[in-house]
Amino acid sequence: GSEMCIRDRSIQLGYGLIEMVDEQTGGPLVNRITGVRKQLSRNLGFVIPSVRVRDDMSLGANQYRLRIGQTIVGEDEVYPERKLAIPGEQSNLKLSGIDVKEPTFGIDATWIEAHKQTEAESHGYVVVEPETVLTTHVSQVITKYAGELLGQDDVQALLDNLANSAPNLVQSVVPKLIPLHSLTGILRELLAERMPISDLRRILETLANLAGKNLSVSESAEALRPGLAGLLVQQIAPLSQPLSVITLSSELEHMLIQMVRQSGEAGLMLDNALAEKMIKSINSASERASAEGQQAVMVVSPAIRKQLSSIIRHHIDDMIVLGFTELPDSRKINVIATISGENEQQN
């Protein structure tokens, strides 16, 4: 029954933010959100349904809230009359304004009066429009919950579309080898880790080859990843640039592989101290990459990829964890940190 409750996606705005959507005053928010939806639909490989924007008098004037179904998946405040100044590496001047944590990346930032923009920029701050702050947050939330936004109807629409060019493939795989609900489950699991599902032909061909193996939904998703990861890597770093990678030290990796082998179905049980150290090191490496405009990904042994990913994503929303079998051969990489579980080594 999870199909029904997911369908409603909305952004609720406090009364002070209504001007951001007012067509008369040229409020750009609705167009910007449509742009985000189209971009993410292209990246993820399915049409992301529209997001309703509506006012909500129970919210504070500057508050907004993002909902999927009944669940609140994000809320924060923006100041339409101000701009958000985000410090760079070299920013040493303290700006006067409203100090906040920026919602998408959790960085300290300051809402400054609009006329102070030039001064802020001359001190190394990046200055962002309020609409951009909100749409970036919306984009992050849709990406994070993409798996939950995909329903069986959406998958059927993707299949109908593919059937125009590959009718025999579609007929021979769904529902003969895989029922629609299982395929939906597999695609949702891929999306939950940002894996694009746009190459549906390849997905069905691979699933047809795996059909005799009796794999679970999770195992099927895992088996599909190496064939799809090239698309994801391309979205993270253009081909001309090396991919910024965080790895584990071989000692730590071997230890985790042993733990997974021993615990079997229970998955990876890390003691808190080790988990905390790892998360902290990964976080700081990732933040260093962000400061240089790169997005870092983790690359680990396929034997622990899935378990490790679910632990890490629990703490660091947008960290992508790839198995080393998933990296395209030709791809240049740049290892920016090696996590040892002791204290981190920077490269």
Predicted features along the sequence, with ranges:
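A polyampholytic, Gly/Pro-enriched intrinsically disordered region
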Residues: 339-347
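Short, small-residue-biased leader/transition segments that mark boundaries at the very start
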Residues: 1-5
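Structured cytosolic domains appended to multi-pass membrane proteins
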Residues: 6-332, 338
